UniProtKB/Swiss-Prot annotation:
Alphabetically ordered keywords of this record: Albinism, Copper, Deafness, Disease variant, Glycoprotein, Melanin biosynthesis, Membrane, Metal-binding, Monooxygenase, Oxidoreductase, Signal, Transmembrane, Transmembrane helix, Tumor antigen, Waardenburg syndrome
Organism classification: Eukaryota, Metazoa, Chordata, Craniata, Vertebrata
Gene Ontology terms: cellular component: cytoplasm; Golgi-associated vesicle; intracellular membrane-bounded organelle; lysosome; melanosome; melanosome membrane; perinuclear region of cytoplasm
Protein name listed in UniProt: Tyrosinase
Primary localization class, coarse: membrane
């Protein structure tokens, strides 16, 4: 019944997601490299007549890149989106969208002047009707073709530089699956050659900002599709979990009774078909995923390689990540040490902060643990657990931002892997967003987390917490300095004592020093610290 109502509502709302706007994929658009569609409100490009925006040249960053991708001019995602477009809508004020027809995140109303803060909640705190509504919304998205966006099924070169467009329709849910595939796919170098060391959303600084935007766009799309402006993606708090407690038919699906790799027939998602999961097949044909169904969701949680991922992350692991003061370090990739991003992503140990190629922890641990569709990077968003998992990862990112209060300059401006510099535009989003735009508090983007609302981020304790953590990290140095100081003090005290004993015979009693009894200043200093 609920699904029937949602289908009726569908046609009342204009949808808007992310990637190639349907209005911008004609040969004329591609050859002129312009994507400035009219806004329906006044039918002018970018809503210019109403002051919403205007068609502008795209200004690309020329900051140097890291050495991980040693090619130029071979991948459509380089200097995004310049291979396809060099002019797009630049929106004014609080307007946003490929035609400036939407509001920026956190703003609402016909003129985008109303501020609102939505709250993402723990999935276990949802009532049964709220939970069922969430599943119904996802199912509706899975069965609704995007009216605004299409996906390319060939490279720009295969389209003969735009003269022969190659695009397919796709449903709204799979549109986002395709985007996650496209941003992380290998580079096709021609012939049978590929380059694997490239990813515009993982293994480098943009991992957290990119997925933050990804969830916001997904959330916004569901809001528009259903007309439910209060919709938010719930999160799964997996800290200290001993098993996949959301892998039941009541929630994200239990195991099939006869095939442990499939979902239970009683699950909401057992009939779902996945897309974009056959990376090696696409690579061998030098082709892109075209959105064709490729079989059912697969998941066998806990039956994974336990030598690589011995357990799910603990509260202590999360707290260690949050204690790291550097967002990024060194090579700014999966070999980075003491990097909050690399540790949270799961390429560095949550015990030491040292990169460890033999282990998958934190964020990566959940993907490996699911032992199925979600375990492959390119196709992982097929599994709706992806949404709940990444919502919680984003909440940890938010905790770090609130605790350390970094300036935007903390996000690397240059020398990060391709696509990850601060001013780089995020692949494959249109409208355009820069990585640094999402290195800010979630509250500035219009959302919060229920479990973070209980603490006051402006309290004195939270304000000084990061400074206390820094002090704890230099404790060994302080201890060494104190020991040296103690030795020097003892020598001085001995010298003074000798002098005093020498003078004690010469001075009246009332003028003798009032020496304290033995007192452990060092212990006192330790206890205060």
């Amino acid at each position: 019944m609920l699904l029937a109502v949602l289908y009726c509502l569908l046609w009342s709302f204009q949808t808007s997601a992310g990637h190639f706007p349907r209005a911008c994929v004609s040969s004329k658009n591609l050859m002129e490299k312009e994507c400035c569609p009219p806004w329906s409100g006044d039918r002018s490009p970018c809503g210019q007549l109403s002051g919403r925006g205007s068609c502008q040249n795209i200004l690309l960053s020329n900051a140097p890149l890291g050495p991980q991708f040693p090619f130029t001019g071979v991948d459509d995602r380089e200097s995004w989106p310049s291979v396809f477009y060099n002019r797009t809508c630049q929106c004014s004020g609080n307007f946003m969208g490929f035609n400036c027809g939407n509001c920026k995140f956190g703003f609402w109303g016909p003129n985008c002047t109303e501020r609102r803060l939505l709250v993402r909640r723990n999935i276990f705190d949802l009532s049964a009707p709220e939970k069922d509504k969430f599943f119904a919304y996802l199912t509706l998205a899975k069965h609704t073709i995007s009216s605004d966006y299409v996906i390319p099924i060939g490279t720009y070169g295969q389209m003969k530089n735009g003269s022969t467009p190659m695009f397919n329709d796709i449903n709204i849910y799979d549109l986002f699956v395709w985007m996650h595939y496209y941003v992380s796919m290998d580079a096709l170098l021609g012939g049978s050659e590929i380059w694997r060391d490239i990813d515009f959303a993982h293994e480098a600084p943009a991992f957290l900002p990119w997925h933050r935007l990804f969830l916001l766009r997904w959330e916004q799309e569901i809001q528009k599709l259903t007309g439910d402006e209060n919709f938010t993606i719930p999160y799964w708090d997996w800290r200290d979990a001993e098993k996949c407690d959301i892998c039941t038919d009541e929630y994200m699906g239990g195991q099939h009774p006869t095939n442990p790799n499939l979902l239970s027939p009683a699950s909401f998602f057992s009939s779902w078909q996945i897309v974009c999961s056959r990376l090696e097949e696409y690579n061998s044909h030098q082709s892109l995923c075209n959105g064709t169904p490729e079989g059912p969701l697969r998941r066998n949680p806990g039956n994974h390689d336990k030598s690589r991922t011995p357990r799910l992350p603990s509260s202590a692991d999360v707290e260690f990540c949050l204690s790291l003061t550097q967002y990024e370090s060194g090579s700014m990739d999966k070999a980075a040490n003491f990097s909050f991003r690399n540790t949270l992503e799961g390429f560095a140990s949550p015990l030491t902060g040292i990169a460890d190629a033999s282990q998958s922890s934190m964020h990566n641990a959940l993907h490996i643990y699911m032992n199925g569709t979600m375990s492959q990077v390119q196709g992982s968003a097929n599994d709706p657990i992806f949404l709940l998992h990444h919502a919680f990862v984003d909440s940890i990112f938010e905790q770090w931002l609130r605790r350390h209060r970094p300036l935007q300059e903390v996000y690397p401006e240059a020398n990060a892997p391709i696509g990850h510099n601060r001013e780089s535009y995020m692949v494959p989003f249109i409208p355009l967003y820069r990585n640094g735009d999402f290195f800010i508090s979630s509250k500035d983007l219009g959302y919060d987390y229920s479990y973070l609302q209980d603490s006051d981020p402006d309290s004195f304790q939270d304000y000084i917490k990061s400074y206390l953590e820094q002090a704890s990290r230099i404790w060994s140095w302080l201890l060494g300095a104190a020991m040296v100081g103690a030795v020097l003090t003892a020598l001085l005290a001995g010298l003074v004592s000798l002098l005093c004993r020498h003078k004690r015979k010469q001075l009246p009693e009332e003028k003798q020093p009032l020496l304290m009894e033995k007192e452990d200043y060092h212990s006192l200093y330790q206890s205060h610290l």
